[in-house]
Amino acid sequence: MYYWDEILNLNFLVLKSFTILPVLVRIFMFLKFSPFFSTIKIGYFNFFFSLILSVIVVEKIKIIYPLDNMLSFALILLGEAILGLIQAFFVNIIFNVFHLVGFFFSNQIGLAYANIFDVFSEEDSMIISQIFAYLFLLLFLSSDFLLRFFVIGIHDSVLNIRVEHLVNMRNSGFVKLLLMSFGFLFEKALLISFPILSLLLLFYLVLGILSKSSPQINLLIISFSTSLFLGLLILYIGFPSLAISSKRVIELSLDSLASFLKLFSRVLK
């Protein structure tokens, strides 16, 4: 009797592990390529954290995977990995809004070639972009945004989006979803950087008028130093309002991410 109980418990553990594995693959791919957990320095943490989350979330899933056909199960794992990458792609769009703001701003004040090594992404990035990225991380970690990130990106997505519906995906709806995400990226980046860019544009317009009226003025030296000083001054003065607008953008981004997941679930179905 004890022997058969051990066999039944072993079979239960095997079936449970095969149920957890697809969820683990999706959560791991989502966290691995998200901007907060993408560094290779915490790769082992990603795996164990994904395993813990998958064990918690899998209890709410009432789906039996086809374990009698290993090819079908392998395709399910591949589909779960693709869904995790798609979710990480949308989260990276939110994060890249602030990098794009820094890119716009750096080009206008003459710091396009001033780069700094980012220890998290392990690549060079512009100084102003790095400042905006750190601002984003501080705002993200100082509020309930991180909790909402896990609830929307892991809990809601696993419960609402199933990999079995990938075969019924309409290409037109998915392309529309991608175009909406890119439009969201440029819209939010321009909204944040528009006041700064408009002042710098006005400054360059004044310089153009001066160059016509006084051709002997060395505008190359004047424009670089003045635009750099003016840009840093605007950044210093407008930093509190910039933090408020950035926080609002993060809130809208998480709401948009939830809307994207709902739209994506309808597209798949």
Curated annotation (Swiss-Prot):
Asked if Cell membrane is a keyword of the record, the answer is yes
**What keywords does the record list, in alphabetical order?**
Bacterial flagellum, Cell membrane, Membrane, Transmembrane, Transmembrane helix
Instruction: List the subcellular locations.
Output: Cell membrane; Bacterial flagellum basal body
Kindly list the residue ranges recorded as spanning the membrane: 11-31, 36-56, 75-95, 127-147, 190-210, 219-239
Q: GO CC terms on record?
A: bacterial-type flagellum basal body; plasma membrane
| Bilayer topology | Multi-pass membrane protein
- Per the record's keyword annotation, is Transmembrane helix included, yes or no? yes
One Pfam family name is Bac_export_1
The domain of life for this entry's organism is: Bacteria
Q: Which GO terms describe its biological process?
A: bacterial-type flagellum assembly; protein targeting
Which PANTHER family does the record match to this protein? Answer: FLAGELLAR BIOSYNTHETIC PROTEIN FLIR (PTHR30065), SURFACE PRESENTATION OF ANTIGENS PROTEIN SPAR (PTHR30065:SF1)
- Record function comment: Role in flagellar biosynthesis.
Family recorded in the similarity comment: Belongs to the FliR/MopE/SpaR family.
**By what name is this protein known?**
Flagellar biosynthetic protein FliR
- What species is given as this protein's source? Borreliella burgdorferi (strain ATCC 35210 / DSM 4680 / CIP 102532 / B31) (Borrelia burgdorferi)
